[in-house]
């Protein structure tokens, strides 16, 4: 439990996206520090492929990829979760990179004044087949695959919207 300091992140991608993100946002809105991570319960709970839910961590330049360094990147918020087909890189608010240490030296926290305008930048990419997959696209969000970029396709294009949630 996050409120008892028993876990550092909430796992995702194995239940409907609206449920998972609702739990995560409520946890954050209650003032708890909690990251989000991808998971695949293969082969324990269901037999979907390994890597169904993925978490990507940015390591500092020149830092060796080790489990410890990767976990510290997740803890510090230098990460994002996806389905392996959609990516958000170099996300910044007013030049403050996700997972950086803020004025109070806490990783991933940037102070901003109430009503302050923020310039948000990021590199985003989505990998979609040329033709829509209507089998996935038309399923209710309560059916697998819960997180899949196909659900976001704009019309018959290979484009998806980028949404910034402001709280």
Where in the sequence are the language-model features?
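Histidine/acidic residue-rich metal-binding segments in metalloenzymes
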Residues: 1-6, 19-35
